[in-house]
Amino acid sequence: MHRRQFLSGLAALAFSPRSSAAEVEVDGVRLNRRLSELTSFGRTLEGGISRVAFSEADREARKLAMSWMREAGLAVRIDAAANVIGKREGRDDSLPPLLFGSHLDSVPDGGNYDGQVGSVGAIEVVQCLEERGIATLHPLEVILFTNEENGKTGSRAMAGELVGSELDLPSHTEKSITEGISFLGGDPARIDDARRKPGEVFAFLELHVEQGAVLHRRGIDVGVVEGIVGIERWNVRVDGFANHAGTTPKDERQDALLTASRIVDAVNGIATETEGRQVATVGKIVAHPGAPNVIPGRVELTLEIRDLDMVKIAKLQSAIEIETRRIAAVNGTSVSFEKYYESRGAFADDRLRNVIRESAEALGLSTLFLPSGAGHDAQSLALIAPMGMIFVPSVDGISHSPKEHTLPEDVEAGANVLLRSVLATDALALD
Protein backbone atom coordinates (compact mmCIF):
# COMPACT_ATOMS: atom_id res chain seq x y z
CA MET A 1 0.00 0.00 0.00
CA HIS A 2 2.75 2.45 0.98
CA ARG A 3 5.63 3.23 -1.34
CA ARG A 4 9.06 2.86 0.18
CA GLN A 5 11.50 4.25 -2.37
CA PHE A 6 14.22 5.92 -0.36
CA LEU A 7 15.51 8.12 -3.15
CA SER A 8 18.37 10.54 -2.99
CA GLY A 9 17.76 14.23 -3.30
CA LEU A 10 18.26 16.88 -0.64
CA ALA A 11 20.20 19.76 -2.14
CA ALA A 12 22.33 22.59 -0.78
CA LEU A 13 22.47 21.46 2.83
CA ALA A 14 25.26 22.06 5.32
CA PHE A 15 27.00 18.84 6.34
CA SER A 16 30.39 17.40 7.15
CA PRO A 17 32.41 16.02 4.22
CA ARG A 18 32.42 12.61 5.91
CA SER A 19 28.94 11.80 4.54
CA SER A 20 26.43 13.13 2.04
CA ALA A 21 23.01 14.14 3.36
CA ALA A 22 21.38 12.40 0.39
CA GLU A 23 22.90 9.10 1.55
CA VAL A 24 21.63 9.35 5.11
CA GLU A 25 18.85 7.16 6.44
CA VAL A 26 17.88 6.19 9.95
CA ASP A 27 18.43 2.69 11.30
CA GLY A 28 14.88 1.38 11.11
CA VAL A 29 15.68 -1.85 12.92
CA ARG A 30 17.17 -0.01 15.90
CA LEU A 31 14.33 2.51 15.91
CA ASN A 32 11.57 -0.11 16.02
CA ARG A 33 13.49 -2.25 18.51
CA ARG A 34 13.69 0.69 20.89
CA LEU A 35 9.97 1.34 20.51
CA SER A 36 9.40 -2.27 21.48
CA GLU A 37 11.72 -1.95 24.49
CA LEU A 38 9.61 0.90 25.83
CA THR A 39 6.62 -1.45 26.17
CA SER A 40 8.24 -2.99 29.24
CA PHE A 41 7.40 0.19 31.17
CA GLY A 42 3.74 0.33 32.13
CA ARG A 43 2.51 -2.72 30.23
CA THR A 44 -1.01 -3.78 31.26
CA LEU A 45 -2.47 -7.29 31.39
CA GLU A 46 -4.62 -6.41 28.37
CA GLY A 47 -1.52 -5.57 26.32
CA GLY A 48 -1.85 -1.81 26.57
CA ILE A 49 0.43 0.79 28.16
CA SER A 50 -0.32 2.76 31.33
CA ARG A 51 2.75 4.95 31.51
CA VAL A 52 1.00 7.98 32.95
CA ALA A 53 3.09 11.03 33.75
CA PHE A 54 4.88 11.02 37.11
CA SER A 55 4.50 7.25 37.55
CA GLU A 56 7.41 4.91 38.21
CA ALA A 57 6.95 3.56 34.68
CA ASP A 58 7.28 7.10 33.30
CA ARG A 59 10.48 7.72 35.25
CA GLU A 60 12.05 4.41 34.20
CA ALA A 61 11.17 4.93 30.53
CA ARG A 62 12.79 8.36 30.68
CA LYS A 63 15.95 6.85 32.18
CA LEU A 64 16.20 4.40 29.30
CA ALA A 65 15.58 7.16 26.76
CA MET A 66 18.28 9.30 28.38
CA SER A 67 20.75 6.42 27.98
CA TRP A 68 19.91 6.31 24.27
CA MET A 69 20.36 10.08 24.06
CA ARG A 70 23.83 9.84 25.57
CA GLU A 71 24.66 7.00 23.18
CA ALA A 72 23.67 9.38 20.37
CA GLY A 73 26.23 11.91 21.62
CA LEU A 74 23.78 14.28 23.28
CA ALA A 75 24.56 16.24 26.44
CA VAL A 76 21.52 15.42 28.59
CA ARG A 77 19.90 17.47 31.32
CA ILE A 78 16.51 17.82 33.01
CA ASP A 79 15.07 21.33 33.16
CA ALA A 80 12.93 22.84 35.93
CA ALA A 81 9.72 21.49 34.36
CA ALA A 82 11.26 17.99 34.22
CA ASN A 83 11.59 18.11 30.43
CA VAL A 84 14.44 15.88 29.28
CA ILE A 85 16.72 17.89 26.99
CA GLY A 86 19.57 16.48 24.93
CA LYS A 87 21.81 19.00 23.16
CA ARG A 88 24.15 18.55 20.22
CA GLU A 89 26.41 21.45 19.37
CA GLY A 90 26.19 23.15 16.00
CA ARG A 91 28.88 24.78 13.92
CA ASP A 92 27.67 28.12 15.25
CA ASP A 93 26.50 27.79 18.84
CA SER A 94 25.62 31.47 18.96
CA LEU A 95 22.54 30.59 16.90
CA PRO A 96 19.28 29.54 18.57
CA PRO A 97 18.78 25.76 18.67
CA LEU A 98 16.54 23.73 16.39
CA LEU A 99 14.26 21.65 18.63
CA PHE A 100 12.45 18.40 17.88
CA GLY A 101 10.90 15.66 20.01
CA SER A 102 7.66 14.58 21.66
CA HIS A 103 6.61 12.82 24.90
CA LEU A 104 6.93 9.42 26.60
CA ASP A 105 3.90 9.49 28.92
CA SER A 106 0.68 7.74 27.90
CA VAL A 107 -2.97 7.88 28.83
CA PRO A 108 -4.21 5.17 31.22
CA ASP A 109 -4.47 1.90 29.29
CA GLY A 110 -3.24 3.49 26.10
CA GLY A 111 -0.79 2.40 23.41
CA ASN A 112 2.93 2.59 22.70
CA TYR A 113 2.96 4.87 19.66
CA ASP A 114 1.35 8.16 20.73
CA GLY A 115 4.36 10.33 21.60
CA GLN A 116 6.76 7.41 21.60
CA VAL A 117 7.30 7.45 17.83
CA GLY A 118 8.29 11.11 17.88
CA SER A 119 10.51 10.73 20.94
CA VAL A 120 12.45 7.67 19.80
CA GLY A 121 12.46 8.98 16.23
CA ALA A 122 14.08 12.23 17.35
CA ILE A 123 16.83 10.35 19.20
CA GLU A 124 17.40 8.15 16.15
CA VAL A 125 17.78 11.21 13.91
CA VAL A 126 20.57 12.61 16.07
CA GLN A 127 22.27 9.22 16.41
CA CYS A 128 22.20 8.89 12.63
CA LEU A 129 23.85 12.30 12.22
CA GLU A 130 26.42 11.48 14.88
CA GLU A 131 27.37 8.13 13.37
CA ARG A 132 27.82 9.68 9.93
CA GLY A 133 29.69 12.74 11.15
CA ILE A 134 27.14 15.20 9.80
CA ALA A 135 27.31 18.60 11.48
CA THR A 136 24.52 21.17 11.48
CA LEU A 137 24.81 24.93 11.52
CA HIS A 138 22.39 25.32 14.43
CA PRO A 139 22.64 23.50 17.74
CA LEU A 140 20.11 20.67 17.94
CA GLU A 141 18.01 19.82 20.99
CA VAL A 142 15.93 16.69 21.41
CA ILE A 143 13.12 17.35 23.90
CA LEU A 144 11.09 14.72 25.76
CA PHE A 145 8.27 16.78 27.23
CA THR A 146 6.69 16.25 30.64
CA ASN A 147 3.06 15.25 31.16
CA GLU A 148 1.74 15.86 27.66
CA GLU A 149 -1.38 13.77 28.18
CA ASN A 150 -2.69 15.63 31.22
CA GLY A 151 -2.15 19.27 30.37
CA LYS A 152 1.07 19.56 28.30
CA THR A 153 2.89 20.68 31.46
CA GLY A 154 6.41 20.59 30.04
CA SER A 155 5.78 22.26 26.70
CA ARG A 156 3.53 24.90 28.21
CA ALA A 157 6.20 25.70 30.80
CA MET A 158 8.74 26.05 28.00
CA ALA A 159 6.40 28.41 26.14
CA GLY A 160 5.71 30.48 29.28
CA GLU A 161 2.07 29.40 29.22
CA LEU A 162 1.88 27.48 32.50
CA VAL A 163 -0.10 29.14 35.30
CA GLY A 164 1.38 28.70 38.77
CA SER A 165 -1.89 27.51 40.28
CA GLU A 166 -1.86 24.53 37.90
CA LEU A 167 1.06 23.05 39.80
CA ASP A 168 -1.25 22.20 42.69
CA LEU A 169 -3.65 20.24 40.49
CA PRO A 170 -3.77 16.43 40.77
CA SER A 171 -2.22 14.20 38.12
CA HIS A 172 -3.18 10.69 36.99
CA THR A 173 -1.09 9.41 39.91
CA GLU A 174 -1.55 10.28 43.58
CA LYS A 175 0.95 13.10 43.13
CA SER A 176 0.18 16.74 42.44
CA ILE A 177 1.85 18.29 39.39
CA THR A 178 4.39 19.88 41.73
CA GLU A 179 5.20 16.55 43.36
CA GLY A 180 5.37 14.84 39.98
CA ILE A 181 7.83 17.35 38.55
CA SER A 182 10.08 16.86 41.57
CA PHE A 183 9.74 13.07 41.24
CA LEU A 184 11.08 13.26 37.68
CA GLY A 185 14.02 15.46 38.63
CA GLY A 186 12.61 18.91 37.92
CA ASP A 187 12.39 21.91 40.23
CA PRO A 188 8.85 23.32 40.42
CA ALA A 189 10.01 26.19 42.62
CA ARG A 190 12.04 27.43 39.63
CA ILE A 191 9.53 26.55 36.92
CA ASP A 192 10.09 29.87 35.15
CA ASP A 193 13.66 28.76 34.40
CA ALA A 194 12.23 26.31 31.86
CA ARG A 195 10.80 29.15 29.80
CA ARG A 196 12.15 29.99 26.34
CA LYS A 197 11.34 33.36 24.87
CA PRO A 198 10.53 34.09 21.21
CA GLY A 199 13.82 34.21 19.34
CA GLU A 200 15.50 31.71 21.66
CA VAL A 201 14.28 28.74 19.60
CA PHE A 202 15.00 28.57 15.86
CA ALA A 203 12.16 26.16 15.06
CA PHE A 204 10.34 23.12 16.43
CA LEU A 205 9.51 19.89 14.59
CA GLU A 206 7.44 17.00 15.91
CA LEU A 207 6.95 13.54 14.43
CA HIS A 208 3.71 11.91 15.61
CA VAL A 209 1.20 9.24 14.74
CA GLU A 210 -1.93 10.70 13.17
CA GLN A 211 -4.35 9.24 15.76
CA GLY A 212 -7.00 9.34 13.05
CA ALA A 213 -7.83 7.15 10.06
CA VAL A 214 -7.33 9.53 7.12
CA LEU A 215 -3.80 8.48 6.12
CA HIS A 216 -4.34 4.76 6.67
CA ARG A 217 -7.63 4.55 4.80
CA ARG A 218 -6.42 6.64 1.87
CA GLY A 219 -3.09 4.85 1.61
CA ILE A 220 -1.07 8.03 2.18
CA ASP A 221 2.45 7.68 3.61
CA VAL A 222 2.96 11.02 5.35
CA GLY A 223 0.68 13.72 6.68
CA VAL A 224 1.89 17.32 6.52
CA VAL A 225 0.10 19.03 9.39
CA GLU A 226 -1.57 22.32 8.48
CA GLY A 227 -2.16 23.22 12.11
CA ILE A 228 -3.44 21.96 15.43
CA VAL A 229 -7.08 22.59 16.19
CA GLY A 230 -8.28 24.93 18.88
CA ILE A 231 -10.55 23.40 21.51
CA GLU A 232 -13.23 25.03 23.63
CA ARG A 233 -15.40 23.25 26.19
CA TRP A 234 -18.53 24.31 28.04
CA ASN A 235 -20.54 22.96 30.93
CA VAL A 236 -24.18 23.13 29.86
CA ARG A 237 -26.96 22.95 32.44
CA VAL A 238 -30.61 22.26 31.63
CA ASP A 239 -33.16 23.04 34.36
CA GLY A 240 -36.66 21.62 34.32
CA PHE A 241 -38.82 20.38 37.19
CA ALA A 242 -38.45 17.01 38.91
CA ASN A 243 -41.83 15.38 39.39
CA HIS A 244 -43.55 12.01 39.66
CA ALA A 245 -43.03 10.00 36.47
CA GLY A 246 -46.44 8.34 36.68
CA THR A 247 -48.80 11.05 37.85
CA THR A 248 -47.53 14.04 35.86
CA PRO A 249 -49.52 14.42 32.59
CA LYS A 250 -47.69 14.59 29.26
CA ASP A 251 -48.53 18.24 28.69
CA GLU A 252 -47.31 19.32 32.13
CA ARG A 253 -43.86 17.77 32.10
CA GLN A 254 -40.74 19.95 32.28
CA ASP A 255 -38.35 17.15 31.39
CA ALA A 256 -34.74 18.36 31.46
CA LEU A 257 -33.47 15.13 29.93
CA LEU A 258 -35.83 15.43 26.97
CA THR A 259 -34.43 18.90 26.33
CA ALA A 260 -30.87 17.60 26.71
CA SER A 261 -31.46 14.79 24.22
CA ARG A 262 -32.72 17.27 21.64
CA ILE A 263 -29.72 19.49 22.33
CA VAL A 264 -27.40 16.57 21.52
CA ASP A 265 -29.17 16.12 18.19
CA ALA A 266 -29.01 19.86 17.50
CA VAL A 267 -25.27 19.99 18.22
CA ASN A 268 -24.64 17.20 15.73
CA GLY A 269 -26.87 18.81 13.12
CA ILE A 270 -25.33 22.27 13.33
CA ALA A 271 -21.76 20.94 13.27
CA THR A 272 -22.52 18.63 10.35
CA GLU A 273 -24.41 21.15 8.25
CA THR A 274 -21.81 23.91 8.69
CA GLU A 275 -19.21 23.86 5.92
CA GLY A 276 -15.71 22.92 7.04
CA ARG A 277 -13.88 20.31 9.11
CA GLN A 278 -15.07 21.41 12.55
CA VAL A 279 -16.40 18.84 15.02
CA ALA A 280 -18.70 19.24 18.02
CA THR A 281 -19.24 16.64 20.73
CA VAL A 282 -21.47 16.14 23.74
CA GLY A 283 -19.30 13.71 25.68
CA LYS A 284 -20.91 13.59 29.11
CA ILE A 285 -24.49 13.69 30.39
CA VAL A 286 -25.63 13.43 34.02
CA ALA A 287 -29.35 13.46 34.88
CA HIS A 288 -30.71 14.36 38.32
CA PRO A 289 -32.07 12.92 40.49
CA GLY A 290 -31.38 9.82 38.40
CA ALA A 291 -34.31 7.69 39.56
CA PRO A 292 -36.45 5.56 37.20
CA ASN A 293 -39.71 6.95 38.58
CA VAL A 294 -38.77 10.65 38.61
CA ILE A 295 -38.86 13.05 35.68
CA PRO A 296 -35.34 14.52 35.47
CA GLY A 297 -35.36 18.04 36.85
CA ARG A 298 -31.76 18.91 36.01
CA VAL A 299 -29.27 17.66 33.46
CA GLU A 300 -25.59 18.59 33.18
CA LEU A 301 -23.75 17.95 29.95
CA THR A 302 -20.52 18.99 28.26
CA LEU A 303 -20.05 20.57 24.85
CA GLU A 304 -16.72 20.51 23.04
CA ILE A 305 -15.99 22.21 19.70
CA ARG A 306 -12.75 21.83 17.71
CA ASP A 307 -11.54 23.75 14.67
CA LEU A 308 -8.37 25.45 13.43
CA ASP A 309 -10.18 28.81 13.47
CA MET A 310 -11.08 30.13 16.94
CA VAL A 311 -13.52 32.64 15.39
CA LYS A 312 -15.36 29.78 13.75
CA ILE A 313 -15.56 27.95 17.08
CA ALA A 314 -17.17 31.04 18.62
CA LYS A 315 -19.68 31.34 15.77
CA LEU A 316 -20.58 27.66 15.99
CA GLN A 317 -21.08 27.86 19.75
CA SER A 318 -23.28 30.91 19.33
CA ALA A 319 -25.47 29.09 16.80
CA ILE A 320 -25.70 26.08 19.11
CA GLU A 321 -26.61 28.22 22.11
CA ILE A 322 -29.36 30.05 20.20
CA GLU A 323 -30.88 26.75 19.08
CA THR A 324 -30.64 25.14 22.52
CA ARG A 325 -32.42 28.09 24.13
CA ARG A 326 -35.21 27.69 21.59
CA ILE A 327 -35.45 23.96 22.34
CA ALA A 328 -35.44 24.59 26.08
CA ALA A 329 -38.25 27.13 25.86
CA VAL A 330 -40.45 24.76 23.84
CA ASN A 331 -40.09 22.14 26.57
CA GLY A 332 -40.72 24.51 29.48
CA THR A 333 -37.09 24.32 30.59
CA SER A 334 -34.10 26.67 30.70
CA VAL A 335 -30.45 26.29 29.73
CA SER A 336 -27.16 27.94 30.71
CA PHE A 337 -23.61 27.74 29.31
CA GLU A 338 -20.30 28.12 31.18
CA LYS A 339 -16.99 27.87 29.31
CA TYR A 340 -14.40 26.05 31.40
CA TYR A 341 -11.59 25.23 28.96
CA GLU A 342 -9.86 26.83 25.99
CA SER A 343 -6.84 25.70 24.01
CA ARG A 344 -6.05 28.00 21.13
CA GLY A 345 -5.32 26.58 17.71
CA ALA A 346 -1.85 26.80 16.21
CA PHE A 347 -0.96 26.95 12.52
CA ALA A 348 2.14 25.23 11.22
CA ASP A 349 4.70 27.51 9.60
CA ASP A 350 4.26 27.56 5.80
CA ARG A 351 7.99 27.19 5.19
CA LEU A 352 8.23 24.16 7.46
CA ARG A 353 5.17 22.61 5.84
CA ASN A 354 6.93 22.88 2.49
CA VAL A 355 10.14 21.46 3.95
CA ILE A 356 8.26 18.43 5.29
CA ARG A 357 6.39 17.87 2.03
CA GLU A 358 9.55 18.16 -0.08
CA SER A 359 11.49 15.90 2.31
CA ALA A 360 8.81 13.21 2.06
CA GLU A 361 8.51 13.47 -1.71
CA ALA A 362 12.30 13.20 -2.08
CA LEU A 363 11.94 9.81 -0.41
CA GLY A 364 9.23 8.74 -2.85
CA LEU A 365 6.52 9.04 -0.20
CA SER A 366 2.99 10.25 -0.85
CA THR A 367 1.80 13.23 1.19
CA LEU A 368 -1.40 14.90 2.29
CA PHE A 369 -1.98 18.23 4.01
CA LEU A 370 -4.37 17.81 6.94
CA PRO A 371 -5.17 19.38 10.32
CA SER A 372 -4.48 17.71 13.64
CA GLY A 373 -7.68 17.10 15.55
CA ALA A 374 -5.75 16.34 18.74
CA GLY A 375 -3.58 18.62 20.86
CA HIS A 376 0.21 18.25 20.85
CA ASP A 377 3.30 19.76 22.45
CA ALA A 378 3.94 21.50 19.12
CA GLN A 379 0.87 23.60 19.85
CA SER A 380 2.65 25.22 22.79
CA LEU A 381 5.97 25.64 20.99
CA ALA A 382 4.19 27.49 18.16
CA LEU A 383 3.82 30.40 20.59
CA ILE A 384 7.57 30.99 20.59
CA ALA A 385 8.93 29.56 17.33
CA PRO A 386 8.00 28.38 13.82
CA MET A 387 6.43 24.93 14.16
CA GLY A 388 6.01 21.95 11.85
CA MET A 389 4.51 18.49 12.37
CA ILE A 390 4.86 15.19 10.53
CA PHE A 391 2.13 12.55 10.76
CA VAL A 392 2.48 8.84 10.02
CA PRO A 393 -0.53 6.52 9.65
CA SER A 394 -2.38 5.03 12.61
CA VAL A 395 -3.80 1.63 11.66
CA ASP A 396 -7.61 1.98 11.44
CA GLY A 397 -7.31 5.38 13.13
CA ILE A 398 -7.11 3.79 16.60
CA SER A 399 -5.29 5.69 19.36
CA HIS A 400 -5.43 6.06 23.15
CA SER A 401 -6.12 2.34 23.13
CA PRO A 402 -4.19 -0.92 23.61
CA LYS A 403 -5.01 -1.57 19.93
CA GLU A 404 -3.06 1.53 18.84
CA HIS A 405 -0.59 0.53 16.12
CA THR A 406 1.62 2.02 13.44
CA LEU A 407 3.46 -0.22 10.99
CA PRO A 408 7.25 -0.47 11.45
CA GLU A 409 7.86 0.72 7.89
CA ASP A 410 5.71 3.80 8.55
CA VAL A 411 7.65 4.54 11.74
CA GLU A 412 10.91 4.30 9.78
CA ALA A 413 9.58 6.45 6.94
CA GLY A 414 8.43 9.13 9.39
CA ALA A 415 11.84 9.22 11.05
CA ASN A 416 13.53 9.59 7.66
CA VAL A 417 11.23 12.49 6.84
CA LEU A 418 12.11 14.04 10.20
CA LEU A 419 15.82 13.54 9.49
CA ARG A 420 15.65 15.29 6.15
CA SER A 421 13.37 17.99 7.54
CA VAL A 422 15.86 18.72 10.32
CA LEU A 423 18.68 19.12 7.80
CA ALA A 424 16.56 21.24 5.45
CA THR A 425 15.26 23.44 8.27
CA ASP A 426 18.81 23.96 9.52
CA ALA A 427 19.60 25.53 6.13
CA LEU A 428 16.59 27.86 6.13
CA ALA A 429 16.47 31.55 6.97
CA LEU A 430 13.45 31.84 9.29
CA ASP A 431 13.85 35.48 10.32
Task: Label every model-predicted segment.
Residues 25, 40-44, 174-226, 264-269, ...:
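Active-site-adjacent substrate-binding region
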Residues 150-151, 156-311:
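Midchain, well-structured core segments that form catalytic/ion-binding scaffolds
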Residues 31, 39-44, 101-102, 367-417, ...:
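Zn-dependent metallopeptidase/amidohydrolase metal-coordination segment
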Residues 28-36, 41, 48-111:
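Acidic/His- and Gly-rich active-site-bordering loop/insert found
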Residues 79, 135-136, 191-195, 247, ...:
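Flexible, glycine/charged-enriched surface loops at secondary-structure junctions
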Residues 53, 281-290, 302-308, 334-353, ...:
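A short beta-alpha structural unit
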Residues 5-21:
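N-terminal export signals
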